[in-house]
Regions:
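Internal "kinase-insert"/substrate-recognition segments embedded within catalytic cores
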Residues: 190, 244-283, 290, 302-308, ...
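Conserved NTP-binding catalytic cores of kinases and kinase-like/nucleotidyltransferase enzymes
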Residues: 43-45, 62, 149-295, 626-631, ...
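Short Trp-Ser/Thr-centered turn/loop motifs at beta-strand boundaries
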Residues: 137, 643, 680-685
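Beta-strand-rich modules
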Residues: 660-675
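Middle-to-C-terminal accessory/interaction subdomains
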Residues: 240, 285, 387-425, 429-604
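Recognizes extended acidic, P/S/T-rich segments that occur
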Residues: 93-105, 114-115, 615-661
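Glycan-association/targeting regions that enable binding to alpha-glucans and other polysaccharides
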Residues: 19-218, 580-590, 595, 663, ...
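Solvent-exposed loop/turn segments flanking beta-strands in beta-repeat/beta-sandwich domains
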Residues: 55-63, 69-76, 603-631
Length: 695
């Protein structure tokens, strides 16, 4: 059941003027409005109820509803929005769908014939008291002045060829994508006028941030009405043909996004960014289908850097009467897109960051995108920070006081791992000032031009040459990069992430999938030929030897191997680090929780021993829930337990039993540090499964 509660939509009924010792009659409140089912199918009766509390006398309620058919969208500013409403009385008689007479819950049933596939139905409630005074729900001041539901019978199958006009039989072959394939990735339906959609995405070529058009977004059966939208992006906003979108939700009606596994994010979104999953054609990487950013942002996040959540979706735009015309380049299906969490106050809440100032950085300066409570409003905090590091060399204490160095080392490490070098022009990152620590953090953004050494930029963001030239900072940075190489950016762990993400949008067995349907929709779409340049036709999978999506995944995995070798040779070549320790055999790969004892080799290195530490992390595919694809697989960089740094060498450790669970698989490692602050590589792991208790 869809419900919105309206505590501030009321009729004020006064028995007499308020004065000392004189009571005011209770105000008539419309406390709740709901409809069921939440997303009806064709031919279903829809029940609408409204609850009224503290009735001061006879009250009547009625519903007004407006029908919006496919291809006939009605904007909020259209005259038809004001006039095209039909009236039905609601009742509290215990009849005609009402459950109980006189309980203050009013009911009306919208007839089955009203529900037609792809139809949007808006409604609002009006209450009238015995004196003729009226009020409505939603309130007239509400940014969404009506409720709504969307009638839908399910995503249909779709058919398309790689190039229906080709002389190549393989490209011309029509492939049928059945409804199960088309429903394998969550769908967002967007209802608007055809001209509004075309103007925003192709015709007007507007480079500004003004939201000129509105539409209705439907996700998980919930309707977000009168949402503003525009194309998004910088200099290449309209260059790819299949362009990016940005939606701005109404105040008080944030968007409940869900991840790739259907789980709702903890914090709702005020804005929705859609990546087009198309890549700039001249870089040869088209067909990665959003994998670069999905995996890339996961790497940032796993390394401890606050980074946008992402999830895939298929965008279905309803601006025509027909859902699936014979022309594969028309109709509702617009292909595969990647949703990116907007970097704003919602982002800070989602990532558990204190409420501080957040700046979108462009052209060497910043625009306040979120104002933290109690923080400055004139950007003086940003100006002071930038002025300080741009004028003269700052000493180590200044950097430690003003920049979150631990976070920066992780940020810089992932920049190197995925070649996120498009940061050199003062863009593609945000600055965030943590009000509790007083330190600035860098938050990554726009990481599509990655995973290949020919991508744009030289990687020279503001802190690389200013921070990492300090010897102490350089050692600390290398320590972190070395750890990320051991535990995250390696063929096994990053390869696991690549496979995990790819399985969301493609069939691991090689059957038809959304990536194939998207390729059929866009590789030879007429708009790609008209635009040319970074668009162009027939550019999917150029980087893959096998010329398919599976080949693009192999290209990413090969890049991990090659880039890791480059990092080791060029960024981590330090002969002074301690030797990598070894773990001595545990005697069994099946251990009980109370017998988790391990030993390591002696310290070895050119420097004097200073410290050591141990860690335990989950490893491998876990049982049950992961087989059902309802959760992500564990990554080794996320420890379940880490020891404190031990200043005295002790070759033995016993893992606390409470940190592991029976039936799970874990890895234990050890690491050594010398007196110069250099940490060794982590030891090769011992992997073990925790056996259930005996008996």
């Amino acid at each position: 059941m869809h419900t919105r509660i309206w505590f501030f939509c009321w009729l004020t009924i006064l028995a007499q003027p308020a004065s000392a010792g004189v009571e005011v009659e209770p105000r008539l409140q419309i406390q709740g409005v709901s409809h069921s089912p939440e997303q009806p199918r064709s031919g279903q009766v829809v029940k609408i109820v409204a609850q009224v509390a503290n009735q001061p006398g006879k009250v009547s309620l009625h519903v007004e509803y407006q029908v919006v058919d496919p291809g006939k969208y009605i904007d909020l500013t259209d005259s038809a929005y004001k006039t095209n409403w039909l009236y039905l009385a609601m009742n509290d008689s215990g009849k005609n769908g009402d459950e109980k007479a006189g309980d203050g819950i009013y009911t009306v049933e919208l007839p089955a014939e009203l529900q037609i596939h792809r139809r949007l139905v808006r409604y609002r409630i009006t209450a009238t008291d015995s004196s003729g005074q009226t009020n409505t729900a939603p309130a007239l001041s509400d940014s969404e002045p009506n409720f709504a539901y969307f009638v839908y019978d399910g995503i249909p199958g779709w058919s398309g060829a790689i190039d229906p006009n080709s002389n190549d039989p393989r490209k011309k072959q029509i492939v049928r994508y059945d409804p199960a394939v088309m429903a394998s990735v969550q769908a967002y339906h967007f209802i608007s006028k055809g001209r509004s959609v075309a103007n925003a995405t192709w015709r007007e070529q507007s480079g500004g941030k003004e939201y000129k058009y509105t539409g209705t977004l439907v996700s998980d059966g919930k309707v977000y009405d009168h949402v503003r939208f525009r194309a998004r992006g910088g200099v290449w906003r309209y260059a790819m043909g299949k362009n990016m979108w940005k939606f701005d939700f109404n105040k008080g009606h944030p968007f409940q996004a869900r991840d790739d596994y259907g789980q709702p994010y903890r914090v709702k979104w005020g804005k929705l960014n859609l990546r087009a999953c198309i890549q700039q054609g001249d870089y040869g990487q088209r067909g990665e289908q959003g994998m670069f950013e999905s995996v890339g942002f996961r790497l940032f996040s796993l390394a401890g850097v606050a980074a946008p959540r992402t999830h895939w979706l298929q965008l279905r735009i309803i601006d025509l009467a027909e859902e699936n015309p014979t022309n594969q380049y028309r109709g509702d299906f617009w292909g595969l897109y990647l949703a990116l969490e907007n970097e704003d106050g919602h982002f800070l809440d989602e990532h558990g960051l204190p409420d501080g100032n957040l700046y979108k950085m462009e052209n060497g300066s910043g625009t306040l995108s979120h104002h933290g409570t109690g923080a400055v409003t004139n950007s003086s905090d940003l100006h002071q920070f930038m002025s300080a590091y741009n004028t003269g060399n700052r000493a180590e204490p200044w950097w430690r006081a003003h920049l979150d160095l631990a976070s920066y080392y992780s940020y810089r490490s992932i920049i190197e791992c995925i070649h996120h070098y498009d940061v050199a022009d003062g863009k593609n990152y945000d600055y965030y000032l943590n009000p509790k620590t007083g330190r600035w953090n860098v938050i990554p953004w726009d990481i599509d031009l990655t995973w290949a050494d020919n991508m744009y930029g030289n990687g020279e963001e503001p802190f690389r040459s200013r921070v990492l030239t300090h010897p102490a900072f350089h050692v600390e940075y290398q320590n972190r990069l070395r750890e990320i190489r051991d535990l995250l950016f390696n063929p096994e762990q990053t390869g696991q992430l690549i496979d995990e993400c790819a399985a969301i949008i493609a069939d691991p067995a090689g059957g038809p999938s959304l990536v194939d349907a998207d390729r059929a929709k866009w590789d030879y779409h007429p708009v790609m030929a008209r635009i040319g340049g970074k668009a162009g036709q027939g550019r999917f999978y150029e980087a893959a030897a096998s010329k398919d999506f599976r080949g693009m995944l192999k290209s990413m995995k090969d890049y991990v191997k090659n880039r890791a070798a480059w990092i080791d040779a060029n960024l981590l070549n330090d002969p002074r680090i301690p030797a990598t320790p070894s773990l001595l055999g545990a005697g069994s790969t099946n251990l009980t929780r109370n017998h988790l004892s391990f030993r390591c080799s002696q310290y070895s290195g050119s420097g004097v021993f200073a410290a050591m530490k141990w860690r335990v992390a989950e490893a491998g595919k876990q049982p049950a829930e992961f087989g059902q694809a309802k959760a992500r697989m564990p990554c080794e960089i996320t420890a379940v337990w880490e020891s404190a740094e031990g200043a005295a060498f002790n070759p033995s450790i016993t893992i606390p039993p409470e940190v592991v669970r029976a039936g799970r698989t874990y890895r234990v490692r050890v690491q050594m540090k010398d007196q110069t602050g250099r940490w060794s590589y982590w030891s090769a792991p011992i992997q073990f499964t925790v056996a259930p208790p005996a008996g």
